[in-house]
């Protein structure tokens, strides 16, 4: 058996994640306009656009554990190929939908067959040495962030020149390229676990190194995504309330991008720091840091100040999801790592669905500032809970 160079796999998986992140961010910003172009009445555009976006996350949350079970049984590379090829059809096929019902149907299928990023994460986590998992998974996460930042620029340019449907064809091409790169260059010598040594899913949660931490890390993923997405629906409106009336969308986009760029810069650095001082320690510190920044955002007095705070916020996010992923990889047996990452993805998706609804509800009742206060409170509770859970482990670097 030849030794697999996990660093080579990391490079290819990073680029695959970049293409996947770009594909997602290419589609979402244009969804309301595309829904309108399909003939939906103006008063229903927001509803159907929201449905088209959320239905994908909901179906992904429901089916993610199934793909995790299959990945542990047949390998992570086949699941990456399956996701890439299936999403080539479901995302590229959006270019040909004749009405809103076909759009919703394809978005539903897209979520059902999604899973390139979590399987890429599980693949690298299963191959990288435990002591370098923070560095590797932190680096891997920057691929999605970089793609998410790049996507809207490419999409806007293509949409202006050739129309929105051409954007969907481009997305399909990106995902097909990700699948081809996986087929040709990703190396995985997967050895199925013998039946008598296989870990049933029911027993998996008790076979990890620290069973009580597993669900806690799942909940942490939920809170991280919930808090991040709760801001999305109100950010542009908050920027306007802070006095920005001209070029509102452009300025709002810059503020979003500032956080993305700082997150991309910090993820690799935070991953290395987590390997050096302990990912569990760094996770608690990063959550406490997030609470402070959310409170500062709630008291911002200008769009420039808000942008600065969001940039600073991004510097800490490199220790959040990558930190959770590193901890999951360290406490989980390799025979069950795909299932654990799949279940974690369920909580991540649910946070992405519930967060925007909660943020909008709080803003409607108490104003835009209140969303940041409420979000900081949620993260503070999660931070305190993690501190209690990790209290006996904070004395050691590795868990």
What are these regions (language model features)?
Residues 106-144, 327:
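Cytoplasmic helix-loop-helix junction between adjacent transmembrane helices
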Residues 30-46, 234-250:
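Short amphipathic helix-loop junctions that connect adjacent transmembrane helices
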Residues 90, 101-109, 293, 304-312:
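Paired small-residue
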């Amino acid at each position: 058996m030849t030794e697999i160079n996990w660093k080579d796999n990391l490079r290819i998986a990073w680029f695959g994640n970049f293409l996947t992140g770009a594909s997602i961010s290419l589609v979402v910003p244009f969804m309301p306009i595309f829904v309108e172009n399909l003939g939906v009445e103006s008063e229903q555009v927001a509803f159907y656009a929201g449905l088209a976006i959320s239905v994908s996350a909901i179906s992904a949350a429901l089916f993610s554990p199934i793909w995790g079970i299959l990945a542990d049984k047949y390998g992570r590379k086949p699941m990456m190929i399956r996701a890439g090829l299936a999403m080539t059809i479901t995302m590229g096929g959006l270019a040909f939908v004749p009405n809103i019902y076909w759009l919703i149907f394809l978005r539903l299928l897209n979520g059902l067959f999604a899973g390139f990023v979590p399987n890429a994460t599980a693949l690298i986590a299963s191959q990288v040495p435990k002591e370098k998992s923070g560095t590797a998974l932190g680096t891997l996460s920057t691929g999605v962030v970089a793609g998410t930042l790049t996507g809207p620029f490419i999409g806007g340019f293509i949409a202006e020149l050739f129309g929105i449907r051409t954007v969907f064809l481009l997305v399909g091409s990106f995902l097909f390229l990700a699948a081809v790169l996986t087929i040709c260059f990703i190396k995985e010598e997967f050895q199925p676990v013998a039946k008598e040594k296989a870990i049933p899913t029911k027993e998996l949660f008790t076979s990890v190194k620290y069973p009580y931490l597993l669900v806690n890390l799942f909940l942490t993923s939920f809170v991280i995504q919930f808090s991040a997405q709760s801001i999305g629906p109100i950010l542009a409106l908050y920027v306007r309330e802070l006095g920005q009336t001209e070029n509102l969308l452009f300025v709002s986009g810059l503020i979003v991008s500032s956080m993305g760029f700082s997150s991309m810069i910090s993820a690799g650095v935070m991953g290395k720091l987590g390997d050096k001082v302990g990912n569990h320690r760094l996770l608690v510190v990063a959550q406490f840091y997030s609470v402070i920044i959310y409170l500062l955002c709630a008291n911002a007095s200008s769009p420039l100040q808000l942008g600065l705070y969001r940039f600073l916020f991004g510097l800490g996010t490199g220790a959040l999801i990558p930190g959770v992923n590193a901890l999951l990889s360290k406490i989980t047996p390799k025979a069950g790592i795909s299932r654990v990452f799949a279940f974690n993805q369920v909580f991540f998706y649910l946070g992405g669905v519930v967060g925007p609804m909660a943020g909008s509800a709080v803003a409607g009742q108490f104003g835009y500032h209140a969303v940041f206060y409420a979000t900081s409170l949620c993260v503070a509770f999660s931070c305190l809970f993690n501190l209690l859970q990790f209290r006996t482990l904070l004395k050691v670097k590795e868990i």
